[in-house]
UniProtKB/Swiss-Prot annotation:
GO terms for cellular component: cell outer membrane. It is a lipid-anchor. It is found in: Cell outer membrane. Pfam families: LolB (PF03550). Its main location: membrane. Monomer. The keyword Transport applies. This is Outer-membrane lipoprotein LolB. It comes from the Bacteria.
């Protein structure tokens, strides 16, 4: 079934799906470090990838919450259904999908790739969302006229900072990420909502 036909069927059945929508398990608590400052980002995402030799795509909204070394990432469809909840802590990663038992692994990328067909680089995003390279990993960078990151190549990803928010804090507005992994290329666009005081 082609992508447009699946989308049309999904949209036609959306009212029924919303009524029968299963929720994902309640939020897992983070390991220790509860007193650490919390950072939150919300916005929209789109991902284009190849799965089983076919071009695929997904889009929706995201909520990123970071507390110390712990991260929770919620991916939500355009109709408000939870696609996935990812929790990453120093002790491991959990991926929660609707109507499925939680999946656990030492790191989240493999979990996402197997379950969703694409994996957001959660480890790198901890720094990239803040407009900086990850420390301790080799990186090639370029900067714009204001001294902010313009491009970053690190850990197999190319990160392009397309726009920055108009704020005193240097917070990206749009980030394009690309990974050329041979037969499994992946491109992701993140549009980050302005922060509210």
């Amino acid at each position: 079934m082609n992508r447009s036909r699946r989308l049309a069927l999904f949209c036609l059945g959306a009212p029924l799906l919303l009524q029968a929508c299963a929720s994902v398990a309640p939020s897992r608590s983070f390991d220790g470090d509860q007193a650490a400052a919390s950072q939150q980002y919300t916005g929209r995402f789109s991902a284009n990838y190849v799965r089983y030799g076919r071009d695929e795509g997904v889009q929706g909204s995201f909520r990123w919450e970071e507390q110390g070394r712990n991260v929770r990432l919620d991916l939500v469809s355009p109709l408000g259904q939870t696609l996935a909840v990812v929790t990453a802590t120093p002790s491991g990663a959990t991926l929660d999908l609707p109507n499925q038992p939680p999946r656990n692994a030492p790191e989240v990328d493999t979990l996402m790739e197997e379950a969703l067909g694409f994996a957001l680089p959660v480890a790198g995003m901890r720094d990239w969302l803040h407009g900086r390279a990850t420390q301790g990993a080799p990186a090639r960078t370029t900067r714009d006229e204001q001294g902010r990151l313009a491009t970053l190549a690190q850990n197999g990803w190319t990160v392009r900072y397309v726009a920055w928010q108009d704020a005193a804090a240097q917070v990206p507005r749009r980030i394009d990420l690309a990974r050329d992994a041979g037969s499994n290329p992946l491109s992701v666009r993140l549009v980050i909502d302005p922060r509210t005081p």
